[in-house]
């Protein structure tokens, strides 16, 4: 029975991924806010009834897609910054890498176009998954008060969505702004103290 349950769960996961892959192809072609469930079902090669078995609403499908891509980006970013050790630099590189990777992905970049409804920013702002991943990353930089980390994580998400919708003049300009206005505030106090040559808080 356990083996059957595992196979069933795996088939469900594969079917859901196939639907999300079809939705992603549509997101590269048109405004994500304008794409309905009928179009996604057709692109995925399934019926509406089948689509609704996996995602009970368009909002649920969008959320699943955003969370899948957020986790994927998170894994790729951790690989890219694996050799960066110093916490402040690690934070800076992770933010600039996130911006670059989202912009380089047409399906993701479409969610942050200012000429369309700001669904990317809205979803990022209310996603517990995105906030939790941001908080986990900040925790990896050094110990700090959990409430402070959670608040900073939410602020980092808002800062990222703001830059995705309203970019700086170029990458160098954005990097300078992040280094000046974000890194000193968001880097944990313990890490900042170590860099300054002082022991951090116990």
Swiss-Prot record:
Residues annotated as transmembrane: none
- SUPFAM superfamilies, A to Z: Homeodomain-like (SSF46689)
Gene Ontology BP terms: regulation of DNA-templated transcription
**Is RNA-binding a UniProt keyword of this protein?**
no
Task: Note the Pfam families from the entry.
Answer: TetR_N (PF00440)
* PROSITE patterns, sorted: HTH_TETR_2
Question: Which protein is depicted?
Answer: Uncharacterized HTH-type transcriptional regulator Rv1255c
């Amino acid at each position: 029975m356990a083996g059957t349950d595992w196979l069933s769960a795996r088939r469900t996961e594969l079917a859901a991924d196939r639907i999300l892959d079809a939705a992603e192809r549509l997101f590269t072609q048109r405004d994500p806010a304008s794409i309905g469930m009928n179009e996604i079902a057709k692109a995925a090669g399934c019926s509406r009834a089948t689509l609704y078995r996996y995602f009970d609403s368009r909002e649920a499908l969008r959320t699943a897609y955003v969370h899948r891509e957020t986790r994927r980006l998170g894994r790729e970013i951790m690989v890219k910054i694996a050799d960066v050790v110093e916490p402040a630099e690690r934070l800076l590189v992770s933010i600039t890498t996130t911006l670059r990777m989202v912009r380089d992905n047409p399906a993701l970049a479409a969610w942050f176009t200012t000429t369309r409804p700001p669904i990317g920013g809205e979803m990022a702002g209310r996603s517990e998954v995105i906030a939790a991943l941001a908080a986990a990353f900040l925790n990896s930089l050094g110990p700090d008060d959990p409430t402070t980390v959670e608040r900073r994580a939410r602020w980092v998400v808002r800062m990222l969505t703001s830059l995705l919708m309203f970019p700086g003049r170029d990458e160098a300009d954005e990097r300078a702004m992040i280094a000046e206005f974000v890194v000193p505030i968001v880097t944990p106090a313990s890490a900042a103290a170590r860099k300054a040559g002082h022991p951090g808080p116990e």
